[in-house]
């Protein structure tokens, strides 16, 4: 893509870009060439610039199959598969989400708090697959009143770390 314009909106900096010219793709179902069917503007979140959230406004061509009516747009390799954001923004959020609050990170990047939370959950799920937990040599058990109820906290006293926090006292 090529950036062509930049302007300030109320809460974000908008970078307008156009996609590079692409030849008409083949229909995945019919195996015949698709024809051009107008353009579409899409907005994607990107990493902050000048301490302001950034939105990429990308204008992409759309293609349509004449026989089956299926629509297609060229894929952008820098976008995340799950979200309307760039891969580098998702990487920045993954690096910072465990060290700062979700609200502060959402305000800084201009995405919703739930988006930050979902990225953090994906990171935690990934870490649970790769990180190996050791059983504490010296175990401490206590309870804490958190979020309106008592919870059981199991700690590793040898390393002064929380090993597990259970939903209830028992």
Positions of predicted regions on the chain:
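Residues in the recognition helix of alpha-helical DNA-binding motifs
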Residues: 96, 108, 119
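Short, conserved DNA-binding cores of transcription-related domains
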Residues: 1-76
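Short, amphipathic alpha-helical "recognition" segments used to contact nucleic acids or chromatin
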Residues: 86-100
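RNase H-like nuclease fold core
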Residues: 118-170
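Short, Lys/Arg-enriched anionic-surface-contact patches
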Residues: 69-89
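Residue-level detection of the helix-turn-helix DNA-binding "recognition helix"
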Residues: 32, 110, 121, 125
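Short coil turns linking two alpha-helices in DNA-binding domains
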Residues: 101, 112-115
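Mobile genetic element proteins and their domesticated derivatives, centered on retroelements
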Residues: 15-16, 27-30, 65, 93, ...
């Amino acid at each position: 893509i090529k950036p062509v314009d930049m302007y300030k909106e109320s809460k974000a900096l908008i970078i307008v870009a156009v996609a590079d010219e692409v030849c008409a793709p083949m229909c995945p179902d019919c195996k015949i060439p698709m024809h051009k069917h107008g353009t579409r503007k899409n907005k994607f979140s990107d990493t902050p610039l000048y301490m302001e959230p950034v939105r990429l406004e990308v204008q992409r061509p759309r293609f349509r199959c004449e026989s089956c009516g299926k629509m297609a747009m060229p894929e952008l390799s820098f976008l995340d598969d799950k979200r309307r954001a760039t891969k580098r923004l998702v990487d920045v959020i993954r690096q910072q989400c465990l060290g700062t609050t979700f609200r502060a990170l959402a305000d800084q990047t201009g995405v919703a708090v739930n988006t930050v939370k979902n990225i953090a959950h994906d990171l935690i799920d990934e870490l649970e697959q790769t990180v190996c937990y050791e059983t504490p040599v010296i175990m401490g058990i206590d309870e804490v009143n958190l979020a309106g109820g008592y919870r059981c906290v199991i700690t590793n006293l040898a390393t002064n770390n929380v090993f597990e926090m259970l939903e209830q006292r028992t």
